[in-house]
Regions:
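Conserved long alpha-helical elements within nucleotide-processing catalytic cores of c-di-GMP signaling
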Residues: 2-3
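Conserved subregion of the PPM/PP2C metallophosphatase catalytic domain
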Residues: 6-180
Length: 180
């Protein structure tokens, strides 16, 4: 599904010229539903979660839309969580709603994070529980002033310490961007 998603993003953004993140996700959903024959019975029951950002460095603005994934923005030690919509790109049971577009004003040294659910869903610790979103956000707040290289090391160390003897259950992707 990821390869299909990458191909669709290129087609929608480059070939069709769609610029708004909410419209891009809407077009992706339509094309995935069509290509997997999801509008009819017997089609593949597959979808994709995604965070999509469009960063305008000159205007210091980020546009964000998400399908089951969020954007975390940390500015001056204040964390803002911009939630993605509770719907995938692809098969949707129930009402098909447009995706939401968030526009976030940025300042120098702000941090942006997009991430999969793998880090926070990982089992570990003394009681074998999930890491959870609140703990993940606290970790990002603790480390956001560090260089991005150091943040990577700290996230990896925390994950390794948390999982200890537990097997990794999902892919883990955390992407951080410092605004300069």
């Amino acid at each position: 599904m990821s390869m299909n998603g990458t191909s669709l993003l290129n087609e929608i953004i480059i070939d069709k010229g769609v610029k708004d993140t909410d419209k891009i996700l809407g077009e992706m959903r339509s094309q995935i539903i069509k290509s997997l024959h999801q509008e009819e019975d017997g089609g593949q029951k597959d979808g994709m979660d995604i965070s999509l950002c469009k960063l305008n460095i000159k205007k210091k603005l980020v546009e964000f839309s998400g399908a089951h994934n969020s954007l975390i923005h940390i500015s001056e030690d204040e964390l803002n969580n911009y939630r993605g919509d509770h719907q995938p790109v692809g098969l949707l049971l129930g009402d098909k709603k447009p995706f939401t577009k968030h526009e976030v004003k940025l300042k120098k040294n702000d941090m942006l994070y997009i991430y999969s659910d793998g880090y926070q869903d990982q089992f570990g610790g003394e009681k074998g529980k999930k890491y959870m979103g609140a703990k993940f956000k606290k970790q990002l707040l603790r480390i956001n002033k560090e260089s991005t290289d150091k943040q990577l090391i700290l996230l990896e160390e925390e994950f390794k310490s948390w999982t200890h003897n537990y097997e990794q259950i999902d892919d883990v992707c955390v992407m951080g961007v410092r605004i300069t």
